[in-house]
Regions:
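Conserved ABC transporter NBD signature motif
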Residues: 62-73, 77-78
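Conserved ABC ATPase "signature" region
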Residues: 102, 106-129
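Conserved catalytic motifs of ABC-family nucleotide-binding domains
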Residues: 154
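Catalytic Walker B motif of ABC-type/P-loop ATPase nucleotide-binding domains
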Residues: 158-162
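ABC transporter nucleotide-binding domain
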Residues: 176-266
Length: 306
């Protein structure tokens, strides 16, 4: 993978709807081979950004380049290399999966052979149901068929906007495995917008977090998590007065939250023994201690701060 080869380059992107600024001077870079996580709370501007990337709406200002070319001037050439799913994919429900892809391939102008269609259906795990009408498909199968549609013209970049919305755990797992497969076996760059943070943590190598249309932070998922303070969860006996103990200690400046029998505190790893010692000395009955760094913790920390 050439990390210096930019597939997506967005600079100063802004979109205003009357008095609402949906995207505000947004900048990000996606490199060849990335599985890039595009994260933000509801209303952060993710879908608006994707719609501008796909020229479904025009930006108020700013610049988008795909494969090093200005999107506005090179739309036709660029989109030969791009596949996308935005919201729920539409199909002819009374036709088979195979027939749908055949028709959609012809509509897109792609030169698709029968063998190509079957290879794509096999790639997304639908080869055994290729002759079934789409109306008999589960939601998860329809999502995989949508990805198959995006693959028809052999793209180098796929844009997925919330591809796991409404799926059960098995469906989410199947989409996750498919994304990893497309990245590792086909070397396709993937731009993945999702609110399921655990999925981004598993599949993405790089990510950006946005809020109120602005870039908060961008970088390697691994490095961002490693630089994040540990979150410690301690289970204790409900009668313990943890709040008073912490407030009168060196840990009073740490961010912590207490429920009836649980303490969540942001803490450097080196300070864990001191915290445990303090609680034990104050006769707190501790039942368990769990240390974790998760994308969810980091996401909440960054978005709440901003």
């Amino acid at each position: 993978m050439n990390e210096l080869e930019k597939v997506i380059e967005i600079n100063g992107l802004t979109k205003k709807f009357k008095n609402l600024t949906a995207v505000d001077n947004l900048s990000l870079n996606v490199y060849k081979g990335d599985v890039f996580g595009f994260l933000g709370p509801n209303g952060a501007g993710k879908s608006t950004t994707i719609r501008m990337m796909l020229t479904l709406i025009n930006p108020t200002s700013g610049n988008i380049k795909l494969f090093g070319k200005e999107l506005k001037e090179n739309r036709k050439d660029i989109f030969r290399k791009v596949g996308a799913i935005v919201e729920k994919p539409d199909f002819y429900l009374y036709l088979t999966a195979y027939k749908n892809l055949e028709i959609l391939g012809k509509m897109s102008g792609a030169d698709i052979s029968n063998r190509n269609i079957m290879q794509i259906l096999e790639l997304v795990g639908l080869e055994k149901r290729y002759n079934s009408k789409v109306k008999t498909y589960s939601h998860g199968m329809k999502q995989r068929l949508g990805i198959a549609q995006a693959l028809l013209h052999n793209p180098e970049l796929i844009v997925l906007d919330e591809p796991t919305v409404g799926l059960d755990p098995q469906g989410i797992k199947e989409i996750r495995e498919l994304i990893l497969k497309l990245s590792s076996e086909k070397q396709i760059t993937i731009f993945l917008s999702s609110h399921i943070l655990k999925e981004i943590e598993i599949v993405a190598n790089r990510m950006v977090i946005i809020n109120k249309g602005k870039t908060l932070i961008e970088g390697s998922v691994k490095e961002l998590l490693n630089n994040n303070t540990d979150s410690i969860t301690i289970q204790f006996k409900s009668s313990s007065d943890i709040n008073i103990i912490l407030s009168n200690s060196e840990f009073s400046k740490n961010l912590f939250h207490i429920t009836n029998t649980k303490l969540n505190i942001e803490l450097d790893e080196s300070k864990i023994p001191e915290l445990i010692k303090l609680l034990v000395e104050n006769k707190v009955e501790i039942y368990s201690v769990e240390r974790r760094k998760s994308l969810e913790d980091y996401f909440l920390k960054i978005t709440e701060k901003n």
